[in-house]
């Protein structure tokens, strides 16, 4: 078990592996592909200041290099939440939480994950999201208030699991 510190970067083990795979792909496959395109362009084209294809390649390379730096930084500084460290007695990073909106009875279930692995369409909510921030540290049965753009909403924690 670890003590949650909101200013740290957290990743689940699977999120860490996904970012590692993305970093490896960018460093090998994407860099090589862009380099090949530069070589092919150099062999067949004349460079000019208005060359949109060349500018597009430069922009793509800049994006790839910036993403590589970002991923390296995140992977070096992240706190990895191991499966064994995911709490079930209180909400934490890695927890699968079922909540119920007190006023409507509507239930939602999601996993609280690191910001870099958040994917709301697949029920993966960043620990930095307002709902997740409000839930972290609370226990099953607790009612928490969350201030959202639509107003204050009260949620009851129905279940917490790994």
What positions do the PLM features span?
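Non-DNA-binding regulatory cores of transcription-related proteins
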Residues: 81-155, 161
């Amino acid at each position: 078990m670890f003590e949650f510190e909101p200013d740290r970067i957290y990743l689940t083990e699977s999120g860490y592996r996904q970012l590692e795979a993305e970093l490896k792909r960018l460093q090998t496959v994407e860099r090589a592909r862009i380099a090949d395109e530069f070589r092919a362009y150099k062999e067949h084209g004349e460079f000019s200041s208005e060359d949109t294809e060349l500018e597009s390649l430069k922009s793509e390379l800049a994006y790839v290099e910036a993403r590589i730096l970002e991923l390296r930084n995140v992977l070096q500084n992240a706190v990895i939440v191991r499966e064994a460290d995911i709490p079930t007695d209180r909400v934490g990073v890695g927890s699968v939480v079922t909540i119920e909106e007190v006023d409507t009875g509507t239930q939602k279930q999601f996993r609280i994950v690191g910001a870099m692995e958040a994917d709301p369409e697949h029920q993966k909510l960043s620990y930095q999201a307002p709902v997740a921030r409000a839930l972290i540290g609370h226990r099953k049965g607790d009612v928490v208030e969350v201030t959202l753009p639509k107003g204050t909403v009260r949620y009851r924690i129905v279940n917490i699991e790994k």
